[in-house]
Amino acid sequence: MSNIDKEKAVAAALAQIEKSYGKGSVMKLGQRPNVDIESVSTGSLGLDIALGIGGIPKGRIIEIFGPESSGKTTLTLHLIAEAQKKGGTCAFIDAEHALDPAYAKKLGVNIDELIISQPDTGEQALEIADTLIRSGGIDMIIIDSVAALVPKSEIEGEMGDAQMASQARLMSQALRKLTASINRTNCITVFINQIRMKIGVMFGSPETTTGGNALKFYASVRIDIRRIGSIKDKEEVIGSQTKVKVVKNKVSPPFKTADFDIMYGSGISKEGEIIDLGVKLDIIEKSGSWFSYNSVRIGQGRENVKQYLKDNPKISNEIEKLVREKSSKVTNINFEQEEEVND
């Protein structure tokens, strides 16, 4: 078959597929109207840079996992706030029945516009999510959490009944169904997950996430979030130092990490990240305990500089813009980059 005949045969096949399944069901990659991946900021400057595209990708499945009180829900609430700032409609499937509206509001979430559901079973939660995604009107949906998606058979059964792998089967079936709708509607779907310990592991990490392996495969981005220390004001603990690692990334190089502060009552400290990344990129000069920007001293001590940036949003935004611009041109800004990951 000559090249011309091949081209005609392919064109005929494409026309037949479009006739059967609709326009846009198949095309050459270069014909796609938007090859660049759209993203939504995470609310963390360092994490946006570590993800490689300025945030989490639209139309993909995201998994955020970590130990208890590590900042999983805080990070997802920041995601909602950032999506709402861009005019997006967000939904929160609260399977844990633990969402605090007052805290969400403090983090910038417009709770009046946030769609919330507190389902009774895992099947109900995932059916609600599927209906919302297929509507095409939802830009982001959060499912909190995979561990709380308890199958109906387990809820209706007796205490102590063995329900082997029922949750894993539920997740596998749901993700097969959801994936096409998520891609078609460009809806960001975030699953919050918990960590469990595998028994009898001699080598490698004994940690694993709940809900089987399906989510690990279907997720385009997996983010591991950990609390690594406390932030104190004299003797009072006012926040936690947090490290996130992008353990899987299908849209950019994976295994990058970022550090940020989560302040109790106000969430991720944007000013703290601007200072740390500004110093790493030589945008902010540090001499002893003094910090300077454009050769002008802006404060002594990190906490004082954070307050200065809060009081001067124009300068804060200016430095943030420079950090984003410079980080896109620099391949390594002292982010740790792991070489392997243990599930």
UniProtKB/Swiss-Prot annotation:
Pfam families, per database record: RecA, RecA_C
Signal peptide: none
Predominant location category: cytoplasm
Binding site for ATP: 66-73
Matches recorded under PROSITE patterns: RECA_1, RECA_2, RECA_3
Gene Ontology biological process terms, A to Z: DNA recombination; DNA repair; SOS response
Superkingdom: Bacteria
Keyword DNA damage: yes
An example molecular function term from Gene Ontology annotations: damaged DNA binding
Localization per record: Cytoplasm
GO cellular component: cytosol
The keyword ATP-binding is annotated on this UniProt entry: yes
UniProtKB keywords: ATP-binding, Cytoplasm, DNA damage, DNA recombination, DNA repair, DNA-binding, Nucleotide-binding, SOS response
Database matches in SMART domains: AAA
Protein role: Can catalyze the hydrolysis of ATP in the presence of single-stranded DNA, the ATP-dependent uptake of single-stranded DNA by duplex DNA, and the ATP-dependent hybridization of homologous single-stranded DNAs. It interacts with LexA causing its activation and leading to its autocatalytic cleavage.
Family: Belongs to the RecA family.
Name by which UniProt lists this protein: Protein RecA
